[in-house]
Amino acid sequence: MSGILEVYDAKRTDNLIITLEGISGSETIKAIKKRIAQKKLKLTEERQALRVEPKGKPLADDQKLSDLGLSSQKAVLYVRDLGPQIAWKTVFMAEYAGPLFVYPLFYLRPTFIYGQAAVNATMHPAVQIAFFAWSFHYAKRLFETQFIHRFGNSTMPQFNLVKNCSYYWGFAAFVAYFVNHPLFTPPAFGDLQVYFGLAGFVISEFGNLSIHILLRNLRPAGTRERRIPKPDGNPLSLLFNYVSCPNYTYEVASWIFFSIMVQSLPAIIFTTAGFAQMAIWAQGKHRNYLKEFPDYPKNRKAIVPFVL
């Protein structure tokens, strides 16, 4: 293929965005995006979603034009402007840093939030433990974002920064307000309930960390290679025998145990909302595994062993 490539607006298919000449079939979608960005400065590479059909699936950056079945003389692609983009890593750092700042305000400065009612209030051990557990969780997330997760050049719409931060920061304030309140009601089963919840929380947190490390080691740096995730020598990774996304399983378990520890309705609501979203993500990844790997273990579920 060597010829002309016309790129139209995917939303207004009669709107010709740009015509590129001297196109070779060996050029990749990434190379085409770069050429478009050079002539249309507003359409940076990250904002472009190129497709063969206006409502078709976005093409991967490493796909070659010769593999798309296009005309060798005059080819047509469609582009959708994804809008201003922001790096995934930046969004993750912001959304996780917020709860690490918001929650301590309620714990360390209760009079600022609750007024004089907090001056003589006795802080229950569950409240103190919850503060350190919450802080550990989000400090771990920041550590993982900086040193464990691989993001490449992936981006997301800038609006996601507002949406994601609103979710995490808002829930941090919601949970913290009631857990640190001067009228906090201690767990019904006392220290046994608190320390049972703490033990489960700690195990789940390290389980989550273990899975993230395993997933990082599964894909060599600088490659797009994908392999079937399997347990390694760490016993916490054995959950891979039952679910495709044990990192989500451990994440949900952490918040279930946190909710047990503080016996707080806002914590339960936060846990439920998180599970609902992670279940959707897990099911999507589970379907992708089944589609990509013919020999993928059929007995695995997405997030809840034997159930979901």
From Swiss-Prot:
- Domain Ubiquitin-like: start-end pairs: 7-85
- Any idea which UniProt keywords this protein has? Endoplasmic reticulum, Fatty acid biosynthesis, Fatty acid metabolism, Lipid biosynthesis, Lipid metabolism, Membrane, NADP, Oxidoreductase, Transmembrane, Transmembrane helix
Q: Which reaction does it catalyse?
A: a very-long-chain 2,3-saturated fatty acyl-CoA + NADP(+) = a very-long-chain (2E)-enoyl-CoA + NADPH + H(+)
Q: Which residues cross the membrane?
A: 112-132, 169-189, 194-214, 255-275
Tell me a GO biological process for this protein: very long-chain fatty acid biosynthetic process
Q: Which GO terms describe its molecular function?
A: oxidoreductase activity; very-long-chain enoyl-CoA reductase activity
The compartments listed are:
Endoplasmic reticulum membrane
The protein's topology relative to the membrane is: Multi-pass membrane protein
Q: EC number(s) of the enzyme?
A: 1.3.1.93
Extract the InterPro entries matched here: 3-oxo-5_a-steroid_4-DH_C (IPR001104), SRD5A/TECR (IPR039357), TECR-like_N (IPR049127), Ubiquitin-like_dom (IPR000626), Ubiquitin-like_domsf (IPR029071)
Q: Name one GO cellular component term.
A: endoplasmic reticulum membrane
The pathway noted for it is:
Lipid metabolism; fatty acid biosynthesis
Role of this protein:
Catalyzes the last of the four reactions of the long-chain fatty acids elongation cycle. This endoplasmic reticulum-bound enzymatic process, allows the addition of 2 carbons to the chain of long- and very long-chain fatty acids/VLCFAs per cycle. This enzyme reduces the trans-2,3-enoyl-CoA fatty acid intermediate to an acyl-CoA that can be further elongated by entering a new cycle of elongation. Thereby, it participates in the production of VLCFAs of different chain lengths that are involved in multiple biological processes as precursors of membrane lipids and lipid mediators.
Which family, according to the similarity comment? Belongs to the steroid 5-alpha reductase family.
Q: What is this protein called?
A: Probable very-long-chain enoyl-CoA reductase art-1
